[in-house]
């Protein structure tokens, strides 16, 4: 099952109520870090400050869904088994994944990259790699399409398109856990000693161990596409400009963004929040003001990450 397009991600801002402003860049902070945003039609953008963005050649025309930095390597995944790697985020190389399934989620911990994806073959796709170059297929404990994967408390946790959860200590052998929703879970994060995941119908669940889960929000106003834990704050983003924040993952505050666009992904770095979404939209925030940035593209952007 193909991943539902842009259910708008979860994230941004952790402090005060956000106001919306559109302005040109007047100043930026020099940083050795790098933001990488990925999207449709092989789109790859980079920025050192989150405000000025440069298009990079991915070598792929497939939709790119997610990216992660680990083991001194950027790894980006996408449709039809696409896996791209880069040492600097600028120059990218296509790798052989061994699958033609669409790949949606990726993480890196315990010296292991874990990638998850579609299920047209009858089982959700799980791939692992030590270096991002050579990949091995693993057996999923579910036939559902797999959407996201995270790591915390010595445990990998993945979520699927039917509200299912699986966990693993090594990323290789997986155990199915009780389904926590009937809707797809598109985004998740680990922080403050707990996992937090959000569904396409706006439900938010938490767990300390990846096995037992609590429903902390029955349903928010909008579908949520992404959740991160950065700057000591959980942030979830989604459709209709939705941004929700929480310090503990349990009590959430809906921010007034003044924006109606769909947000798909969010990250924090260089003392700034960066949010990406449909139509090439990129917004940044210092925690108080949400500012529209020029991306140079009109295609949907799915995720954004920051490497220090």
What do these predicted ranges mean?
Residues 2-4, 13-34:
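Bacterial Sec-dependent N-terminal signal peptides
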Residues 25-308:
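Residue-level hotspots at or immediately adjacent to binding/recognition sites across diverse folds
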């Amino acid at each position: 099952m193909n991943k539902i397009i842009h259910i708008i991600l979860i994230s941004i801002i952790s402090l005060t109520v956000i106001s919306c402003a559109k302005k040109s860049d007047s100043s930026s902070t020099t940083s050795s870090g790098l933001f990488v945003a990925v999207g449709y039609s092989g789109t790859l953008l980079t920025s050192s400050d989150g405000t000025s963005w440069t298009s990079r050649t991915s070598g792929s025309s497939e939709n790119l869904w997610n990216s992660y930095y680990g083991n001194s390597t950027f790894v980006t995944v996408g449709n039809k088994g696409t896996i791209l790697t880069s040492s600097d985020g600028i120059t990218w190389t296509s790798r052989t994944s061994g699958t033609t399934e669409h790949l949606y989620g990726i993480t890196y911990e315990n010296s292991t990259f874990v990638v998850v994806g579609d299920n047209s073959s009858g089982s959700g796709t799980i791939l692992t790699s030590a270096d991002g170059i050579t990949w091995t297929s693993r057996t999923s404990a579910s036939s559902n399409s797999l959407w996201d994967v995270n790591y915390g408390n010595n445990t990998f946790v993945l979520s699927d398109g039917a509200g299912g959860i699986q966990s693993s200590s090594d990323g290789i052998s997986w155990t199915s856990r009780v389904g926590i929703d009937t809707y797809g879970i598109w985004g998740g994060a680990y922080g403050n000693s707990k996992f937090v995941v959000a569904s396409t119908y706006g439900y938010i669940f938490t767990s300390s161990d990846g096995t037992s889960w609590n429903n902390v929000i029955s349903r928010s106003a909008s579908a949520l596409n992404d959740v991160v834990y950065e700057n000591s704050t959980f942030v979830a983003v989604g459709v209709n400009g939705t941004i929700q924040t929480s310090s503990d993952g349990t009590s959430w505050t809906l921010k007034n963004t003044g924006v109606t666009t769909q947000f798909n992904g969010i990250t924090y770095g260089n003392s700034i929040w960066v949010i990406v979404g449909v139509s090439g939209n990129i917004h940044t925030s210092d925690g108080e003001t949400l500012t529209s940035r020029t991306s140079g593209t009109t295609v949907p952007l799915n995720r954004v990450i920051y490497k220090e």
